Amino acid sequence: MAPVAGRSYVRRMKPGEHPDFYRFAPPPGTSRESTIRLDAEGKFWHDGERVDHPALEKALHEWIALHPDDGRYILTNGYDWTYFKVDDAPYIVRTLRVKADGVSLVLSDESEEPLAPETLRVGAGDALYVKVKGGKFTARFSRHAQTALAPILHEDKPGVLRLTVGGRDYPIG
């Protein structure tokens, strides 16, 4: 609706903008717990079945958040929310772009952000992990993204890795 001179308009608040949104009881006959699960490869499952609809899977990745009171993983679209299980990391680094001045990560929610090299660490099975979303979440590198790091990844001694970005070296913890 186009603004009309002399009239004021109030934007309607989405439920998710209410300060107590995450404290509201679930709809009658339902629970905030769900059978939705995110596996270590970044694939969503519901009731044991793979979520394979591309638009739904994209939305689920975009809805990942932390409950503000208990810190558990939730999915929220601003109108409702539910808890879900995360097998490993809530985000996956799908691809990366290596530039002379740094590396940018493309995450499973299709967002792009600069790599924070000081937050890199090696986990089980030699998987690489990094902090994302302002350090609030962890992302696991896909095999493709981890391989793309090879040109700037160096092994000084067996098992001791460092990353060279923008002329600086970062040890990987």
Predicted regions and their residues:
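Terminal leader/tail segments of proteins
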Residues: P3-G173
